Amino acid sequence: MAIGLVGRKAGMTRLFEDDGAAVPVTVIQVEKNVIAQVKSLEVDGYRAIQVTSGSVKASRVNKPMAGHFAKAGVEAGRVVCEFTLDATDSAEYKVGDEVSVTIFEAGQKVDVSGRSKGKGFAGVIKRWNFSTQDATHGNSLSHRAPGSIGQNQSPGRVFKGKKMAGQMGNKNVTVQTLKVVRVDEEKGLLLIKGAVPGATGADVVIKPAVKA
């Protein structure tokens, strides 16, 4: 896996192509991403870099993390994220180095991970797109009910993974193979075609696409 970035979802807008076609884009504000740790094959058993992004009050940093940042000599960040390096990545990374939006370029495909908007406890129609049952014809209390959830005495249980009512959203989600439309190095912005997980202001992780 190649190195990525941690950014903040700033919202959505649109750009216009030369032929006038509107392209919906998500604007991601990339704050300073600083390398806080470099993991090596000899010491840690695998190669990776750990980056920290954003800013946070000193009172909001626990003692183990405060010591970790102090040892690295970097300012404590709001988010800590690790990127595993593969054998083809021969770049030399040092603690304290900054990773900027220039690691991506317009036209590149990326995967964006974030925490989806929480919708609370939802029924099967909203959560799983089930069809409603009859409004009339003798149906009185089961208009939005799921219906049968199993078989008979065999197997005598409900199978794991059965689509039922429950907590919707508020999960880690990755949207794959999104196109980078524009990179603004001066303002630290990434404009990515389409929607990405999370609410405005949420932290997202952008990595080169694994399926590109």
UniProtKB/Swiss-Prot annotation:
Entry GO MF terms: rRNA binding; structural constituent of ribosome
Name of the molecule in the record: Large ribosomal subunit protein uL3
Protein species of origin: Hahella chejuensis (strain KCTC 2396)
The encoding gene: rplC
N5-methylglutamine: residues bearing it: 153
Modification after translation (UniProt): Methylated by PrmB.
Self-association state and partner proteins as the record states: Part of the 50S ribosomal subunit. Forms a cluster with proteins L14 and L19.
InterPro entries reported for this sequence: Ribosomal_uL3 (IPR000597), Ribosomal_uL3_bac/org-type (IPR019927), Ribosomal_uL3_CS (IPR019926), Transl_B-barrel_sf (IPR009000)
Residue segments, region Disordered: 135-155
Keyword terms: Methylation, Ribonucleoprotein, Ribosomal protein, RNA-binding, rRNA-binding
UniProt xrefs under HAMAP family: Ribosomal_uL3_B (MF_01325_B)
